[in-house]
Amino acid sequence: MLGPTPELDQTLQAYDYLLPETFIAQTPLVPRDRSRLLVVQQQAHQHKIFQDLVALLQPGDLLVFNDTRVIPARLLGRKLNSELAQPVEVFLLEPRQPNTWLALVRPGRRLKPGAQIEFGPPERPLLRAEILATDADTRGRIIQFESLVEEPFEDLLEQLGEVPLPPYIQESTAQPEQYQTVYAQHPGAVAAPTAGLHFTPELLARLQSEGINQAHLTLHVGIGTFRPVETDDILQHHMHSEWVDLPAATVDAIRTTKASGGRVIAVGTTVTRALEGACQNGPLVPWQGRTNLFIYPSYQWRVVDGLITNFHLPKSSLLMLVSALVGRERLLALYEDAIAQQYRFYSFGDAMLVLPEAVIAERSPDPVF
């Protein structure tokens, strides 16, 4: 077993690896649950198919899912009072108030507070937006939308917007619903919680029939999920924040699972951040708020016992999170084998299951339940 190297674990370069571009999946598999699954055990690892998940978990285990839904966050419009009908791109980041959003706009330098943008056909625009202010933290804009027809903003967004794909997906023929989990419920994300893309309704039903329980929370994945770590010392990295809704039913399910000896398996890094972030200042309770928790090696775990996740970008905070479970050296060795076995990487790629027996990290001594 590879051992921890604490000082090296804090350096950004230690999380680098070489991935040929041909390994970056551009389209999702059909059916979803035919993707490959690298199963991380205590000493060894196995290569399986995602459908095998039923046999790899135990009755009494609890899968926790992120039920956020990706919104059509990219809008193309035109600036009003512009002689040249200047095109404007608006990328919604997060809601601030009803019909009011924080957004990135291009070209931003020409869009000052008071500027207006219209969307839809020029002869019959459907939606209008006004720039209210510049956000000091992101340099984005606070934008208020107004429907120009008898349809709510949410419906117009579905008509006019485009679901954004990650920047490394450039040649995809994927349909918008293929970048949604089958259990997506609450609109608000600008990127999918991709570990959940492998589940089908049939697989969820099989898991339930075998006594593997399911619970949900909501974390609206933000654009910060693609932001690289840029500081040589990762401890100097400022983690982006994301909005979380952890309902009482999920907290109860986690307590019941732990009390009966079951294991909590997070479906994705977003669920991991939400659960661990919710109990940083005390016991796990129902909670709504923002988390900017940065998980890296030496983190002491509180709730999560195991993890289902995709394969992540070099030098990313997500790679550091998974390293906090199994150790950085072992994770990079697993990635090396995945490349040798021609796994597909990133959002539309294959998956990894970190079983609880593979976790080498310490548990927090603080009471959580």
Swiss-Prot record:
What EC numbers are recorded for this enzyme? 2.4.99.17
Q: Where in the cell is it found?
A: Cytoplasm
Q: Which InterPro entries match?
A: QueA, QueA_dom1, QueA_dom2, QueA_sf
- Predominant subcellular localization, coarse grouping: cytoplasm
What reaction is this protein's catalytic activity?
A: 7-aminomethyl-7-carbaguanosine(34) in tRNA + S-adenosyl-L-methionine = epoxyqueuosine(34) in tRNA + adenine + L-methionine + 2 H(+)
User: Does this UniProt record's set of keywords contain Ribonucleoprotein?
Assistant: no
Q: In which pathway does it act?
A: tRNA modification; tRNA-queuosine biosynthesis
Give GO cellular component annotations, separated by semicolons: cytoplasm
Indicate the enzyme's highest-level EC class. transferase
Q: Which UniProt keywords apply?
A: Cytoplasm, Queuosine biosynthesis, S-adenosyl-L-methionine, Transferase
Instruction: Say which domain of life the source belongs to.
Output: Bacteria
UniProt-listed GO biological process terms: queuosine biosynthetic process; tRNA wobble guanine modification
Alphabetized GO MF terms: S-adenosylmethionine:tRNA ribosyltransferase-isomerase activity
A single Pfam family, by name? Queuosine_synth
Keyword Cytoplasm recorded? yes
Where, if anywhere, are coiled coils annotated?
none
Q: Which family does it belong to?
A: Belongs to the QueA family.
Job description of the protein: Transfers and isomerizes the ribose moiety from AdoMet to the 7-aminomethyl group of 7-deazaguanine (preQ1-tRNA) to give epoxyqueuosine (oQ-tRNA).
Assembly mode: Monomer.
**HAMAP family cross-referenced by the UniProt entry:** QueA
Mind telling me what this protein is named?
Answer: S-adenosylmethionine:tRNA ribosyltransferase-isomerase
Q: Which gene encodes it?
A: queA
